[in-house]
């Protein structure tokens, strides 16, 4: 009669250890995702891997907002990492490579709508 109770306690203890280990490891090894965009344009058949439509970009930002992810700037991420601050596992960073006009024309209004910061890396050859 005592064997089932002991077995039950062992199983519950093992489950608790696994859950605690998962929580610890998730927090210990968590990395902040950096969402990197190039172009936010309606048609991009020649480079589909670096383009996203305005509608798709809107849906992605809506997902981030709806599921309460915290969007921080790249500068905030660097500061937090250098100060060894713990960030929420729902923290993300948004960046744009090249700083093309479509980033401003189509991406910026959506970012502004949600109040999301973003870092834009400009191509220096295009400046001035």
Set out the residue ranges of the language-model regions.
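Active-site beta->alpha N-cap acidic-glycine motif
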Residues: 31, 42-44, 48-61, 65-128
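N-terminal Lys/Arg-rich, disordered targeting/topogenic segments
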Residues: 1-7
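Hydrophobic membrane-insertion alpha-helices, especially the h-region
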Residues: 10-26
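Short loop/turn segments at strand-loop or loop-helix junctions that form parts
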Residues: 36-40
């Amino acid at each position: 009669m005592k064997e089932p109770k002991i077995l039950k306690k062992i199983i519950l203890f093992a489950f608790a250890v696994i859950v605690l280990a998962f929580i610890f490891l998730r927090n210990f090894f968590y990395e902040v995702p950096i969402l990197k965009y190039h172009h936010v344009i309606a048609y991009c058949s020649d480079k589909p891997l670096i383009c996203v439509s305005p509608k798709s970009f809107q849906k992605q930002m809506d997902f981030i907002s709806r599921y309460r992810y915290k969007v921080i700037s790249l500068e905030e991420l660097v500061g937090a990492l250098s100060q060894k601050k713990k960030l929420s596992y729902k923290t993300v960073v948004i960046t744009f490579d090249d700083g093309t006009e479509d980033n401003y024309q189509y991406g910026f209004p959506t970012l502004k709508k949600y109040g999301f910061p973003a870092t834009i890396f400009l191509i220096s050859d295009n400046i001035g």
